[in-house]
Amino acid sequence: MNTEVDRKIAVILVADVVGYSKHMERDENATLKAYAECEKLLKTCLKKYKGSIFNTAGDSVLAEFPSAVNAVECGVAFQNDIKKRNESDKTEVKLEFRIGINMGCLLYTSDAADES
């Protein structure tokens, strides 16, 4: 058995709603509607800055980017879009997001015998 190790630099952005559970307790339908609106804004930013979602969990989104610059610019643009959305008089539920960005080396292992 020959195990090969491949490495790849990854830049990950994590977006998470502040106080999501409390919003859901107050008004589940309005919160879900608000989250869907915010998710559209995020997807627009991701497309513009070449990010792609690779995992979601509840109110959290994890996206990978080709560079740290792209991830930071996306995070800033998304926060600006959320601010504009929340300032609208039509907005029932005003959601806030925390954004985290990390860059590091991923290790991939593959068993060469399994690939034949």
What do the PLM-derived regions correspond to, one by one?
Residues V17, F65, M103-G104, S110:
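Residues immediately flanking
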Residues S21-M24, N86, L107:
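Short amphipathic alpha-helical interaction patches enriched in hydrophobic/aromatic residues
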Residues Q79, T91-K94, S110:
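Cross-kingdom TIR/SEFIR domain
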Residues K83-T91:
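Active-site phosphate-binding and catalytic loops of NTP-dependent enzymes
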Residues Y108-S116:
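Single conserved hydrophobic/aromatic residue that forms the stacking wall/gate
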Residues M1-C74, D81:
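Catalytic NTP-binding/metal-coordinating core of nucleotidyl cyclase/transferase enzymes
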Residues V93-L107:
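A short glycine-enriched loop-to-beta-strand structural element that forms part of the catalytic core
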